[in-house]
């Protein structure tokens, strides 16, 4: 069935035309993918334990929480192209800081990293809305997600492997090379020639858009569901390498689990087809349920690491089902004249996840052992299961 769905994509001329644009998301993601498992492990080395890693990531997120809301203001002062270039440049500078061996420079690098990732997500969402017709978004979104997370499937293991077996500096050099490749691909696609009218970037204090956003039930639902999904992945990315390292499995095994769990996204075209065939609501309900049950089982078997990591991989399958929806709930709900302002607010789900997950676990890990994180993750995924029932049946 999966091959039939993929073949169906390749035979659809309308979708095939946008494959180069979907591939752009692979290139954009390379810089952060190769450092994905390196960063929590380096943080663990610098601060000493998982609870302090949580505190560090929480403080970094506090510094970056306003980034998404400031993007429309930044775009008004520059334009879409320059905003994207600022994001890419910030990524390159952040890598240089992250390479150093001191805590203060690592913290500065993490703040810049949060800024670059968040602002780039906003820019790319705007480019998607400019380039892809609304009726083709449900078909394009799984391709976009596959392109981005193929990089996330390869990068975590490759980065740790190169750092441990070849040279400590090599993953950081690859990350910087990824920013250069992003700029080259950006111009090859002709995205530098695309623009948005200044009025589309909104005006005034971006904080005032929060009220407008959350007064719209469909936007509120889209934000809540993607927040729960993003929070689970945040837990998976940060704490899986730490759990593997502290349980005796080793850093490379932890990075491999992150890569394998992310590799489930190769099935995204199937889940996109499933959502169109049986409804997005059913897909998300099923994904949240699988992730909830498997996360609970990981906690139960956390004392047997080899069993726990297998269960964790299957929990990632549930989260991947949710990725099959992409940003469709938001993209179909947002008003065209408000897309810049509402995109800035919507993208705060990443900042809130970056803030809430380490903050929540910093408190839990003060009193409990590391496996408690899996109960926490199961808890909010259960909430997502309940919220998914509010997705309109026609979707």
Where are each of the predicted segments found?
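Juxtamembrane intracellular "pre-TM" segments in multi-pass secondary transporters
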Residues: 2-15, 191-224
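Helix-loop boundary and gating motifs at the non-cytosolic
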Residues: 8-61, 218-257
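Loop-to-transmembrane helix entry/capping segments in MFS-fold secondary transporters
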Residues: 50-51, 134-144, 251, 334-346
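Helix-to-loop junctions at the C-terminal end of transmembrane segments
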Residues: 67-79, 163, 267-280, 365
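Structural signature of the two symmetry-related core transmembrane helices
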Residues: 82-96, 176, 282-296
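Cytoplasmic helix-loop-helix junction between adjacent transmembrane helices
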Residues: 113-148
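A late C-terminal transmembrane helix in Major Facilitator Superfamily
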Residues: 337-366
């Amino acid at each position: 069935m999966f091959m039939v769905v993929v073949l169906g994509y390749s035979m659809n001329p309308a979708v095939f035309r946008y494959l180069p644009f979907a591939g752009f998301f692979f290139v954009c993601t390379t810089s952060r993918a190769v450092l994905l498992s390196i960063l929590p492990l380096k943080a663990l080395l610098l601060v000493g334990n998982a609870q302090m890693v949580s505190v560090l990531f929480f403080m970094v997120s506090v510094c970056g929480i306003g980034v998404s809301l400031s993007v429309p203001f930044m775009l008004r002062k520059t334009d879409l192209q320059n905003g994207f270039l600022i994001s890419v440049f910030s990524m390159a500078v952040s890598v240089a800081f992250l390479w150093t061996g001191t805590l203060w420079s690592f913290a500065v690098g993490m703040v810049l990293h949060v800024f670059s990732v968040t602002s780039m997500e906003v820019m790319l969402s705007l480019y998607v809305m400019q380039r892809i017709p609304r009726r083709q978004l449900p078909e394009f979104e799984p391709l976009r997600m596959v392109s981005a997370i193929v990089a996330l499937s390869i990068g975590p293991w490759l980065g740790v492997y190169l750092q441990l077996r070849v040279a400590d500096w090599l993953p950081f050099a690859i990350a910087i090379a990824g920013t250069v490749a992003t700029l080259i691909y950006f111009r090859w696609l002709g995205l530098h020639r695309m623009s948005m009218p200044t009025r589309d970037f909104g005006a005034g204090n971006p904080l005032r858009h929060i009220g407008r956003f959350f007064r719209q039930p469909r936007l509120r639902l889209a934000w809540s569901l993607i927040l729960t999904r993003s929070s689970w992945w945040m837990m998976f990315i940060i704490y899986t390498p730490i759990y593997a390292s502290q349980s005796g499995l080793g850093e490379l095994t932890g990075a491999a689990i992150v890569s394998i769990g992310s590799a489930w996204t190769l099935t995204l075209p199937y889940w996109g087809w499933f959502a169109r065939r049986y409804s997005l609501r059913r897909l998300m309900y099923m994904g949240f349920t699988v992730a909830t049950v498997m996360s609970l089982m990981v906690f139960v078997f956390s004392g047997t690491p080899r069993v726990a990591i297998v269960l964790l991989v299957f929990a990632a399958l549930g989260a991947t089902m949710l990725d099959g929806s992409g940003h469709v709930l938001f993209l179909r709900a947002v008003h065209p004249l408000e897309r810049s302002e509402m995109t800035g607010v919507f993208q705060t789900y990443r900042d809130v996840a970056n803030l809430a997950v380490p903050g929540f676990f910093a408190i839990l890990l003060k009193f409990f052992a590391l496996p408690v994180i899996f109960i926490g993750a199961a808890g909010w995924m259960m909430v997502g299961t309940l919220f998914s029932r509010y997705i309109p049946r026609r979707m």
